[in-house]
């Protein structure tokens, strides 16, 4: 495990050789920068949802309906004309990078605002606000809505905003949550629901973990956690856990996939770390127990990060259930520490995250399944980008055991953003620009 790696895809196919990990940094890699920019400038619009809200008077969230104020507008049937006009309103200059695409036969739209709108703002919300405003104006103009009914159209698109901070009950949705929901500085790219990531990747576990790793590590860069010596530390984790560097993740999963356990994954990780000279025996106790030392601490952390994800793929894959991801994060690292005498992934922060995660995801509290958590959540934000990729992988492998399914929370996001190749297959995208 040198700082020059080979990048492999989710099928173990070599994509790019002799890659300097520094070229994988969000500050340098063009594909990662494109993913981040497209994340900020893109929103999904549920045209079928708008049509249903207008017809029923149901808007602004659950339990809210204004009887007698329905509008029978054929929104889906006019999707082409709506898309054309929305593009004219959203674009800054003729022929710029504005993009408006019909999805699912006109039931949804993907609106990508031009980069100039994002650059001209202090945050990323202009994609949502401009997109929602353009759709609202287009519908009112197209159907000749009078001032009396205009608020109904606005509420069908925008939901209960501005009475609520977010567009609750609205039909315009981005990958990112609103900035007001962030737990601290630089958390925007980490405030993405695991279900969203799994939906975008079409439930491909390794691509889900890769996309999540890109978001998480980019967030660490944004919050100042990858400065100086910590940059190498984070990039090694991104390369090996997120981008299958040297095919290590794929090989360990393949080795343990048939009848492996968390314990056998630990054996695979420790053996490879010893063979690569990353760790070596420091001293031997009278009992014969070996205490190891890390000859390269960030590389040992990368090994632990790969192992944590591999154990998740093996364990959650065997059960086809996401619920055991929290216990996998916990006990893989707990046993790894006992096996080596070295800290687990992220120096105990993944293990610590898993303790609270177990309680809040399905223990006696049990308020939500793993898929609704993110790297901004008060329970799961504590790891520096190494826990949530495992959660996204587990959710992708889930066969329908979650209380909050991918389809119920992230159907629109998956349909719209999953149509963008760089989101759906991020490993290939990153390797493709090297």
From Swiss-Prot:
Binding site residues for coenzyme M: 365
Keywords assigned by UniProt, alphabetized: Cytoplasm, Methanogenesis, Transferase
Enzyme class: transferase
Cofactor binding note of this UniProt entry: Binds 2 coenzyme F430 non-covalently per MCR complex. Coenzyme F430 is a yellow nickel porphinoid. Methyl-coenzyme-M reductase is activated when the enzyme-bound coenzyme F430 is reduced to the Ni(I) oxidation state.
Catalytic activity: coenzyme B + methyl-coenzyme M = methane + coenzyme M-coenzyme B heterodisulfide
One record GO biological process: methanogenesis
Record function comment: Component of the methyl-coenzyme M reductase (MCR) I that catalyzes the reductive cleavage of methyl-coenzyme M (CoM-S-CH3 or 2-(methylthio)ethanesulfonate) using coenzyme B (CoB or 7-mercaptoheptanoylthreonine phosphate) as reductant which results in the production of methane and the mixed heterodisulfide of CoB and CoM (CoM-S-S-CoB). This is the final step in methanogenesis.
Name used for this protein in its record: Methyl-coenzyme M reductase subunit beta
